[in-house]
Amino acid sequence: MTATWSVNKKIFLQNAITVKNNQPLMAVVKNNAYHYDLEFAVTQFIHAGIDTFSTTSLREAIQIRQLAPDATIFLMNAVYEFDLVREHQIHMTLPSLTYYYNHKNDLAGIHVHLEFENLLHRSGFKDLNEIKEVLKDHHHNQNAKMIISGLWTHFGYADEFDVSDYNVERSQWMEIVEALLSEGYQFDLIHAQNSASFYREGQILLPHHTHARVGIALYGSRPYSSLNQHDIVQSLTVKAHVIQVREVQAGDYCGYSFAFEVTKNNTKLAVVDIGYGDGILRTRAKHEALINGKRYPIRALMMSHMFVEVDGNVHAQDEVILYNNDIRIDEYTFKGVGANSEQLSAMNHDSLKKEYISNDC
């Protein structure tokens, strides 16, 4: 028996179609499409009617170009391999005045999207004046030069409801967009909304925008907890099996470093063939596993095993579900286990058996 990571292809595709909601999306496929596999995800998103993609890796951007020759591909990180960017017709962020002036000549022929820093402060121009400085310098540049195709930002607080920061960053961004458009500047692509913002706005684009730049929702995880589970459906299942069921007594310690102290006689512990070496986070192991439709508490986590406290209804070879649509990634995000993407990224695709299922199993 080998622990398995599996995706239902039909559910994945249908979720992408539902998330898209007939709106133009830029699908975020960074980090190997959130570890769902870049080729698989891009292919499914194309079937869902998505033809625009973004990533943080030039290597991935080139791979997307090979998969989708006619797609628009946006690189969210600035890079310095300008010839490769040109060769593969990759759009790229323009992250700062310094980068622009240092590489103005290198950027000739490359499509760039002007980036507004906003509240995240990770990258981008500080304010409207910096953006206009680039636009004016670019206008007067008589040499071979870059092609300004886009305008973008990232909302870092769209999933925060207890503070006003999303409203602040949204307002600041819209002021930038409207000021530039009112002065006659035009952009082929304007994008800012992540999954949380897209859903907060009712799955429609903000005014003047051409795309929403959606990531985690396309992979079946809700960006915030008040969304109904039926709105975003998880296609991923991570499962293992019971190797054996052990009976232990009050006062026994089970697992390394006294991980679990037994408090009742004749306690049953299922030994399960999955552990942190397969990508189960220790924070996730503070919660439950699903066996035969019932949740049971995980009591100890080891590299290749875990102990789950069970009852007489659990037997050797029973399936143990760590994640599926009934025990979801996003549920444990909201319980503090870690971000949706953190839990997905932890999965060890070298030790887990990887499957793509074509039916409704």
Curated annotation (Swiss-Prot):
SUPFAM superfamilies xref list: Alanine racemase C-terminal domain-like, PLP-binding barrel
Lineage: Bacteria, Bacillati, Bacillota, Bacilli, Bacillales
Protein name as catalogued: Alanine racemase 2
Pathway(s) per entry: Amino-acid biosynthesis; D-alanine biosynthesis; D-alanine from L-alanine: step 1/1
Biological role: Catalyzes the interconversion of L-alanine and D-alanine. May also act on other amino acids.
Pfam families found in the cross-reference section: Ala_racemase_C, Ala_racemase_N
GO terms under cellular component: cytosol
EC number: 5.1.1.1
Organism for this UniProt entry: Staphylococcus aureus (strain Mu50 / ATCC 700699)
Statement: the UniProt record of this protein carries the keyword Isomerase: yes
Positions carrying N6-(pyridoxal phosphate)lysine: K30
Similarity comment text for this entry: Belongs to the alanine racemase family.
